[in-house]
A protein has these predicted regions:
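Hydrophobic packing residues within well-ordered alpha-helices of enzyme cores
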Residues: 16, 60-62, 118
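Short beta-strand-to-loop acidic/aromatic patch adjacent to the donor-nucleotide binding site
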Residues: 97-107
Length: 166
């Protein structure tokens, strides 16, 4: 089965307070999204890359692809208002059965082992999420915003990406 990396780049970066989304800011001479795509471009088990992006930044992604010779980048799709709309656009772009690895464009530090582990886990499971133990204290509140419970950190994880699906 083919392994497709779906780079979710539709965010507007409002929380960052910049004029452009954070995936298009430069770090170490390249845009963050370039670093992220490079990881998947260079991974031997990734067959294809699709980027889901806000319509205003399609040309930017095309330029990035040409400049870096990203030959695995086959599709640039329009992102939706919410993350799930963008994810659905990627799902709908493939009629055949494929493994889809959804990854945030602003997480360029994903490594080969994590990608390998996700793909390998899809041999057993239909859905896989990368998760790390939480170090934060999480609180549960009621309608009055009063603390009603503090769950044990032993049972909690922070979900990360990629999130992979058959």
């Amino acid at each position: 089965m083919r392994n497709i990396a779906v780079i979710l780049a539709g965010g507007s970066g409002q929380r960052l307070g910049e004029n452009i989304p954070k995936q298009f800011l430069k770090i170490a001479g390249k845009k963050v999204i370039e670093h992220t795509i490079t990881v998947f471009q260079n991974h031997s088990l990734i067959d294809e890359i699709v980027v889901v992006v806000h319509p205003d930044y399609i040309r930017d992604v095309e330029d990035i692809s040409l400049r870096n010779s990203f030959n695995k980048l086959k599709k640039i799709l329009l992102g939706g208002k919410e993350r799930y709309h963008s994810s659905l656009a990627a799902i709908n772009a493939y009629d055949e059965e494929v493994n889809l690895l959804f990854h945030d464009s602003v997480r360029p530090l994903v490594n080969e082992r994590i990608i390998n582990d996700c793909i390998r886990a899809l041999l057993t499971y239909n859905a896989v999420d990368v998760a790390i133990p939480t170090t934060d204290t999480i609180i549960q509140v009621d309608d009055n915003n009063e603390i009603v419970k503090i769950p044990s950190r032993i049972l909690l994880r922070n979900g990360q990406t990629p999130q992979a699906f058959k």
